């Protein structure tokens, strides 16, 4: 109805809400359809919580590259929301564990570490991700084994 009246803003708002409803109902196909309709109508700033759930849904479906893209875009569009840190961690994890892109993983983890948002709850995960990405890049030894004289 909003679309037919040319009220794009209202259409985007309702479409984002529908997407959230479908995500909560675990209807991935309908949620994805809503997300695509939102994007195709020019929506660029989906609410961070909904966007994070879309990225997680894609990750669950093993659509890792698209999930990484959505995590990354979420972090760029909503840099001042806590979901941005979670998105950076998700993108870093995917780059490191699923996409074999440790340099990108390191960039995401470092961006999370540099975030001005409070993130003490995630600091250990961030630091572990940085260490693991550096190890994958050969920047630090994986383990230090004592040698016998």
Label each PLM-derived region with a short phrase.
Residues 17, 53, 90, 128-129, ...:
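"A position-specific structural signal for the A-helix of alpha-solenoid helical repeats
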């Amino acid at each position: 109805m909003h679309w037919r009246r040319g009220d794009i803003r209202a259409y985007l708002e309702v479409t984002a809400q529908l997407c959230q409803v479908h995500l909560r109902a675990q209807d991935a196909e309908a949620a994805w359809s809503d997300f695509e309709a939102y994007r195709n109508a020019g929506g660029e700033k989906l609410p961070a919580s909904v966007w994070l759930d879309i990225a997680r849904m894609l990750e669950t479906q093993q659509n890792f590259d698209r999930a990484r893209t959505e995590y990354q875009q979420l972090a760029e569009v909503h840099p001042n929301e806590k979901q941005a840190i979670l998105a950076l961690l998700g993108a870093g994890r995917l780059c490191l564990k699923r996409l074999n892109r440790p340099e990108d993983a390191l960039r995401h983890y470092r961006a999370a570490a540099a975030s001005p948002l409070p993130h003490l709850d995630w600091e250990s995960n961030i630091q572990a991700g940085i260490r693991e990405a550096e190890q994958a890049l050969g920047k630090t030894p994986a383990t230090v084994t004592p040698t016998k004289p």
